[in-house]
């Protein structure tokens, strides 16, 4: 009798273990899927675009990270109240940007909590006339032909497109080669993919 119950208990423990592991795997997949669906522009990327739109001229070697000088510039201008570089660009920051530009924020047009690259690009396009150097921004359709990994003649922060060579900082080029993309540029610098 005792061995029969011991065998049942062992089988039950194994089944519970399998169920718990399965639930854990499903939960991890769900979290990963939702995270990738909601990834958008972060404050470091947004500050870079906004700094260029305001006429900021970047220097070489400022800070520990590629985005330090842009964040310092935006903080100095007091465009946003409180943020971290890796924070998502949210509706709160969009309101602060509109306020900085002296434009009324329209809740209905910007109902999303976080902004994708495309949504942020549209927001910048609508505000470009309110920035001191907004007319220096361009939206260029191009295909990435080569990256520094592929061509040793390209410097570490350069990319070759079918429209010419552009510099970039803080962008991930994986998955962009041989694909038509829209870039937000300022001169020969790619600020972001749209």
Regions found by a protein language model. Name each.
Residues 163, 187-188:
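Residue-level signal for tight coil/turn positions that link beta-strands
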Residues 189-194:
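OB-fold/S1-family single-stranded nucleic acid-binding modules
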Residues 172-183, 187:
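Short nucleic-acid-contacting surface segments enriched for D/E, G, S/T with interspersed K/R
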């Amino acid at each position: 009798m005792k061995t029969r119950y011991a065998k049942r208990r062992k089988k039950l423990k194994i089944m519970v273990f399998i169920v718990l592991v399965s639930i854990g795997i499903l939960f991890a997949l769900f979290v990963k899927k939702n995270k990738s669906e909601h990834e958008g522009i972060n404050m470091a990327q947004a500050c870079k675009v906004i700094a260029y739109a305001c006429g900021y001229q970047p220097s070489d070697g400022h800070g520990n990270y590629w985005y330090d000088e842009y964040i310092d510039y935006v903080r100095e201008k007091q465009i946003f109240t409180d943020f971290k570089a890796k924070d998502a660009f949210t509706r709160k920051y969009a309101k602060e940007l509109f306020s900085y530009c002296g434009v009324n924020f329209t809740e209905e047009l910007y109902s999303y909590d976080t902004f994708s690259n495309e949504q942020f690009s549209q927001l910048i396009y609508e505000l470009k006339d309110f920035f001191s150097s907004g007319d220096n921004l361009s939206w260029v359709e191009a295909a990435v032909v080569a990256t520094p990994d592929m061509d040793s003649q390209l410097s570490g922060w350069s990319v070759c497109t079918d429209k010419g060579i552009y510099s970039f900082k803080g962008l991930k080029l994986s998955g962009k080669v041989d694909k038509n993309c829209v870039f937000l540029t300022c001169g020969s610098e790619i600020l972001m993919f749209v």
